[in-house]
C-alpha cells in the first residue's frame, strides 16, 4: 500500500503562534512573584488532544467573563472573541494575552472599517463558530450569516442597504467565489467584497483536492469540532474519493483499506505533528 502525505498537513501559522504564546506563559512565570492562574477564553484551538495536554499542565478554560478572578491571565483563543466580551474580561481585572490569529484579527479590522461606513455585512460562515461570533461583533451596522448558497438565497435582503461580503477565514474558497458572483449579479457594483479567507486554508484545500484525485482513499486527521478539518473531509466527498475523518490513529483498522492501493493523508490546521506522524506510522504498518 502506497501512502501520500500532504505537505500542508498540520498546524497553520495562527495555531502555532497561539500555542507558542500559551507555552511561554506556562514555561516562564515571573521571577519572585506568585504564579498566576492561566486560563484560555474558550478552547484555544479545536483539538481535544491538545486541550487535554494543557489541562494536565493546569491551564483552565472559561467561557464566561464572570467566572474570571481578578489577576488571572486570560489567553484569547486563536479564533478570537467578540469585542464586548474582551471588554468584560478587562473589566474583571484580568491580564489579557491576545492569541487571536493575525488573519482573524485582520478580518475583524476590515469588517469594522466597512461597518463604520454604514454597510451591512453578509458573512459566509458557521453561525455558531466562535470566530464568526467574534467577527459579527464588529459588524455594528447590521449583519446576515449564511452557511451555504441555499441559506443565502433564503435571506430577505432588500435593495435599500449597502452590503459587503466577507467569509470566515477557514471557509471553502470555491464556494465563496460562487457566492460572490451570485451577489454581484444581484446587487451590482455596489457590493464590496473582502478577501478574508486565509491563504493557508486555500492552499490546504487545494492540496486536499489534488490528493483526492491522486489516491484511492483519503484519511483526514483533526478534531471533530474543527471547521477547517471538516471542510477537508468535504473536499474528498465532493471529489468522490472514499475517505474517513479521524482524531487519532486509534480509530484506524486494516479492514478500512481493503482493496485500496494508494492512501492519502492530510490534516487540519489544529492537528499536532505527533498525531499525524502516529497515523502515518500505523498506516505504513498495514
Curated annotation (Swiss-Prot):
Residues reported in the UniProt entry to bind (2E)-4-hydroxy-3-methylbut-2-enyl diphosphate: 46, 79, 129, 169, 226, 228, 270
InterPro entries cross-referenced by the UniProt entry: LytB/IspH
State the Gene Ontology terms under molecular function. 4 iron, 4 sulfur cluster binding; 4-hydroxy-3-methylbut-2-enyl diphosphate reductase activity; metal ion binding
Name the pathway it acts in. Isoprenoid biosynthesis; dimethylallyl diphosphate biosynthesis; dimethylallyl diphosphate from (2E)-4-hydroxy-3-methylbutenyl diphosphate: step 1/1; Isoprenoid biosynthesis; isopentenyl diphosphate biosynthesis via DXP pathway; isopentenyl diphosphate from 1-deoxy-D-xylulose 5-phosphate: step 6/6
Gene3D superfamilies, alphabetized? 3.40.50.11270, 4-hydroxy-3-methylbut-2-enyl diphosphate reductase, catalytic domain
Binding annotation for [4Fe-4S] cluster:
12, 101, 198
Q: What is this protein called?
A: 4-hydroxy-3-methylbut-2-enyl diphosphate reductase
Sequence similarity: Belongs to the IspH family.
Keyword match 4Fe-4S: yes
Q: Which UniProt keywords apply?
A: 4Fe-4S, Iron, Iron-sulfur, Isoprene biosynthesis, Metal-binding, Oxidoreductase
Active site, UniProt feature: 131 (proton donor)
Q: Which cofactor does it need?
A: [4Fe-4S] cluster
List residues binding dimethylallyl diphosphate.
46, 79, 129, 226, 228, 270
The record's section on PANTHER family has: 4-HYDROXY-3-METHYLBUT-2-ENYL DIPHOSPHATE REDUCTASE
Catalytic activity, EC: 1.17.7.4
GO terms for biological process, alphabetical:
dimethylallyl diphosphate biosynthetic process; isopentenyl diphosphate biosynthetic process, methylerythritol 4-phosphate pathway; terpenoid biosynthetic process
Say what the protein does.
Catalyzes the conversion of 1-hydroxy-2-methyl-2-(E)-butenyl 4-diphosphate (HMBPP) into a mixture of isopentenyl diphosphate (IPP) and dimethylallyl diphosphate (DMAPP). Acts in the terminal step of the DOXP/MEP pathway for isoprenoid precursor biosynthesis.
The record lists isopentenyl diphosphate as bound by: 46, 79, 129, 226, 228, 270
Q: Recite the UniProt cofactor note for this protein.
A: Binds 1 [4Fe-4S] cluster per subunit.
| Annotated catalysed reactions | isopentenyl diphosphate + 2 oxidized [2Fe-2S]-[ferredoxin] + H2O = (2E)-4-hydroxy-3-methylbut-2-enyl diphosphate + 2 reduced [2Fe-2S]-[ferredoxin] + 2 H(+); dimethylallyl diphosphate + 2 oxidized [2Fe-2S]-[ferredoxin] + H2O = (2E)-4-hydroxy-3-methylbut-2-enyl diphosphate + 2 reduced [2Fe-2S]-[ferredoxin] + 2 H(+)
Amino acid at each position: 500500500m502506497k501512502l501520500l502525505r500532504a505537505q500542508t498537513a498540520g498546524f497553520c501559522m495562527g495555531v502555532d503562534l497561539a500555542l507558542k504564546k500559551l507555552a511561554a506563559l506556562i514555561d516562564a512565570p515571573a521571577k519572585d512573584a506568585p504564579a498566576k492562574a492561566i486560563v484560555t477564553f474558550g478552547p484555544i484551538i479545536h483539538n481535544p488532544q491538545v486541550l487535554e495536554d494543557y489541562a494536565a499542565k493546569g491551564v483552565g478554560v472559561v467561557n464566561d467573563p464572570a467566572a474570571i478572578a481578578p489577576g488571572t491571565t486570560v489567553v484569547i483563543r486563536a479564533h478570537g472573541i467578540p469585542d464586548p466580551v474582551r471588554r468584560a474580561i478587562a473589566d474583571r481585572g484580568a491580564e489579557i494575552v491576545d492569541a487571536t490569529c493575525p488573519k482573524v484579527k485582520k478580518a475583524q479590522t476590515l469588517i469594522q472599517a466597512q461597518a463604520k461606513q454604514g454597510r451591512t455585512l453578509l458573512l459566509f460562515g458557521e453561525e455558531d463558530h466562535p470566530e464568526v461570533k467574534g467577527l459579527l461583533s464588529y459588524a455594528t451596522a447590521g449583519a446576515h450569516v449564511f452557511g451555504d448558497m441555499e441559506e443565502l438565497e433564503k435571506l430577505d435582503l432588500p435593495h435599500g442597504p449597502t452590503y459587503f461580503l466577507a467569509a470566515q477565514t477557514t471557509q471553502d474558497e470555491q464556494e465563496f467565489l460562487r457566492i460572490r458572483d451570485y451577489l454581484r449579479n444581484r446587487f451590482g457594483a455596489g457590493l464590496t467584497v473582502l478577501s478574508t479567507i486565509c491563504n493557508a486554508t486555500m492552499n490546504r484545500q487545494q492540496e486536499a483536492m489534488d490528493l483526492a484525485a491522486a489516491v484511492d482513499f483519503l484519511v483526514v486527521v483533526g478534531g471533530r469540532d474543527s471547521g477547517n478539518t471538516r471542510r477537508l473531509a468535504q473536499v474528498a466527498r465532493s471529489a468522490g474519493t472514499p475517505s474517513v475523518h479521524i482524531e487519532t490513529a486509534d480509530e484506524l483498522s486494516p479492514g478500512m483499506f481493503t482493496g485500496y492501493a494508494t492512501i492519502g493523508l492530510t490534516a487540519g490546521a489544529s492537528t499536532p505533528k505527533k498525531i499525524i506522524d502516529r497515523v502515518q506510522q500505523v498506516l505504513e504498518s498495514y
